Amino acid sequence: MVSTATQIGHFSFDNCLMNAAGVYCMTKEELMEVEKSQAASFVTKTGTLEVRPGNPEPRYADTRLGSINSMGLPNNGFRYYLDFVSDLAKTGQHKPHFLSVVGLSPTETETILKVIMASDYEGLVELNLSCPNVPGKPQIAYDFETTDQLLENIFTYYTKPLGIKLPPYFDIVHFDQAAAIFNKYPLSFVNCVNSIGNGLVIEDEQVLIKPKNGFGGIGGDYIKPTALANVHAFYKRLKPSIHIIGTGGIKTGRDAFEHILCGASMVQIGTALHQEGPAIFERVTKELKTIMVEKGYQSLDDFRGNLRYKD
């Protein structure tokens, strides 16, 4: 029997597919739609210390090859999502979940994580170090010194399962430098990647979205090669205890297969989920299992990370 079951840290999942933070996760109702689908789990909208309305609309647009967005982290505040995942865990349901959070300063991040630490939530936390769409706020994980200092401080008080969502890196030296930092800490996972920041899509003679004069994060088909490269680069560099979640350009079973082949333990779907809805998880799961049957693979472990190079 072909299985797409997987594991992140000590958490087991009956499938390897889930939503990406930002899509189908703003409200409890949206999260429950993902919960009731064939997704293995869900990740919440990235929650900040206070409620945020986000950037002015229009701030999202579908394109021929994916999407562009400058949402600006709209969310209901991290406590809204923390309360929801905590309450859901008490119902006895079997799915572990991911709580996505970030502070707009190191102090805010510490405040958020200390509240989670003191709560009864025992699930996974995804710390978003890579949002490219908050005006005046750089992507934290591009500053290696700041990232190192932030993680060093976090792990002086935070002992629950924690992973980080990363921006895409483009230089081999940066893969080496980032991995050296991440390997110092007891991270449960890294998520590769968030959208490619500050792209520009034009229709006729006008930009598609309003914030930042049309500049926004690029998702979908555009970013799959970059996402695959980041997944594989970190798979080869990180210690085995740090699992990898692959995000970027997944809309078919073949796309998911390639992410896992590059080393991903789990796969998140963003743009295609926004376009197709939660039914996408059933379709992509079937397509992935069909590929596995054709290739004689019974489990993800049979091919994870086994990307072949040319001689």
UniProtKB/Swiss-Prot annotation:
Q: Which residues bind FMN?
A: 45-46, 128, 165, 193, 220, 248-249, 270-271
UniProt subcellular location: Cytoplasm
Q: In which pathway does it act?
A: Pyrimidine metabolism; UMP biosynthesis via de novo pathway
Presence of the UniProt keyword Oxidoreductase in the record: yes
Transmembrane regions listed in the UniProt entry? none
Name the coiled-coil region(s). Answer: none
Catalyzed chemical reaction(s): (S)-dihydroorotate + fumarate = orotate + succinate
The record's active-site residues are 131 (nucleophile)
PANTHER family to which the protein is assigned, alphabetical: DIHYDROOROTATE DEHYDROGENASE (FUMARATE) (PTHR48109:SF1), DIHYDROOROTATE DEHYDROGENASE (QUINONE), MITOCHONDRIAL-RELATED (PTHR48109)
What's the protein name?
Answer: Putative dihydroorotate dehydrogenase A (fumarate)
| Organism (species) | Streptococcus pyogenes serotype M3 (strain ATCC BAA-595 / MGAS315)
Lineage, top ranks: Bacteria, Bacillati, Bacillota, Bacilli, Lactobacillales
Q: Which gene encodes it?
A: pyrD
